[in-house]
């Protein structure tokens, strides 16, 4: 049907007869001559329709609408000097049309414009409802091509390193670790259920036991959890596992993988090695285990300086086992008014959203003088003031913002405020303009975290991470005193404040695996019922192994400079886990439920209220 792509035509094609297919991007009538911008996946080219040289083609062109599908026959010629378009790859040529065939027309009005010339801030809900049309937009088309490039580059690298792609089951069984499962009833095995995998975690470990040694998969994963901009109920992981490699070797190989992807997709040579930071240092300095290191404003712990001062908000927080931390905002005196920091202000609101009661502040003036509320100023000695300024490195013009309370809340609040101010004050570029790629390995994660509501320990990542041998010995009866500080051989790769991927060395000894499962509250009988197949596998000569998984959707979001992963997925769900285009999820016939031995107990709240 076509001889060339619209965006492929160049000066070397002048005088060639061509056939093109595509959509009408724009149509312009310039008093007797009609110009059509014809668009396909390769780009856009100008079509000139002259009634003196093609009367039938002109008659068709007079009535064309945007997004009409055309086949055009014509000859490539040079554009007149006055109409050259340097913004287009095809801007030096045009096609003089001799024939136009309408392959399909547009019925009714388009829900939103597609042409790059007419792009507007269309509501996302409307875009998702008509996703097939939204995908024609250059931005979306480019994102999907970039996604394909990213996966292709990863496959090429891994296969060159001796990895093989193996598919693992999508229908599996529900296990108690991780987030909530999506479950599916079995028709054949009445009363029993499959679960969709949250990750291929156990299967890839079994592949290592099976001697595969180097595995990867572009895996579909499913989690029934509350959603946000960078999460979806179904998502894609680049899943990797390998045997006979220690943590250092795994980190090195995956740095090489990331560098290979960035080179292939962005043409960038990333500096190596990537910096590393322990989980403890990340939490202390940034308040988060995924710090954005493109800018400063690190958290400074000043608990020891203010623990005895008369300002009870500070001293009380330390007395109750919490912390007082602050961030130093350079130029903050001029950039941030008191109104923005106090209740009702935008900066105050950011802290409040993270659970903080508010923010205290100190403005550093010329000569090291400070300006703050009386309750702080009156209770801060000269020695404490000088120590604060020294520890924070605050120069005149700096604004110090303080959080006080339990350490977790202080960290969360100041982390949120820090990220907010970095954007507000121009310390980082907008996503689409970003040219900083600050990678960071976060290592030495805690093995466990304590769940105070259930009065038990839980695995911070998952219960298959190998513990650091220095922290947990082989005798589980001696673990009680070391659990709070026990580290896992786990690692995350962070990019510009977002987790790009994470993994660990795995437990490959069945006795240790049972001990860890018991520690996180899974009795031996239940552990055997849920994970007996894994224990059996570990008992037949399981090799030392480890790996990690990268979030493909998030990786592509960062490479594309998008704010949401929904703009890097062909057919995403909303934050309510709905597909607006197909209206999924939807109801099913009673007969289907009967065949599955399932009865619905759902009651529509609107109907219940009306009764």
Curated annotation (Swiss-Prot):
Catalyses which reaction(s): tRNA(Asx) + L-aspartate + ATP = L-aspartyl-tRNA(Asx) + AMP + diphosphate
CDD domains the record matches: AspRS_core, EcAspRS_like_N
Record's keyword terms, sorted: Aminoacyl-tRNA synthetase, ATP-binding, Cytoplasm, Ligase, Nucleotide-binding, Protein biosynthesis
Enzyme class: ligase
Residues binding ATP, per UniProt: 223-225, 232, 499, 551-554
GO aspect biological process, one term: aspartyl-tRNA aminoacylation
Binding site for L-aspartate: 177, 223, 461, 506
Region (Aspartate): 201-204
Pfam families: GAD, tRNA-synt_2, tRNA_anti-codon
Xref: PROSITE patterns: AA_TRNA_LIGASE_II
Cystine residue pairs: none
SUPFAM superfamilies with a match to the protein in the record: Class II aaRS and biotin synthetases, GAD domain-like, Nucleic acid-binding proteins
UniProt family annotation: Belongs to the class-II aminoacyl-tRNA synthetase family. Type 1 subfamily.
Cited NCBIfam families: aspS_bact, PRK00476.1
Protein name: Aspartate--tRNA(Asp/Asn) ligase
Organism, scientific name: Synechococcus sp. (strain WH7803)
